[in-house]
């Protein structure tokens, strides 16, 4: 979710006719996330759209605080080391698309951001804790993951790139990694780790 002070990029697009007007670079505004869950314009100005309804597109990703050079192909990626909670959170990408033709008389416009990437959760358990010590799991990696792509802000569609690498994950009884949504071939080894120095997959 969003925290106080997070910078959110929004495209506020006037709809001048019946045809859908898609976002353009000049529609971009940087917003501040406030304590009450609202968003305010980072430039401190008041922006009014009295004549035409508006549609809204936007995103939040840690470190992205300016308009992308090409909003139809925004480079996105995940780090290959996600061993801390902070690294996990910074790997996320929130996206919103509201094509409801909002009008000025609406006092509140609610935006529902969604997680554009996928979270893989892992849970380890054993029926023989006397012989298998889960605390001795080390070097956990999700292997052969596509780690970069391009996101279309207008549609929310993700085009995967070609960079493939392993993701080093935090080892715990329950933990997760963030990945770009992608198909996993059947019977492919998804992860491996060491248990007491012995490799498992």
Q: Where is each model-derived feature located?
A:
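Short aromatic-acidic-glycine turn motif
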Residues: 143-155
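Short, low-hydrophobicity acidic/polar segments
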Residues: 1-135, 163-186, 190-201
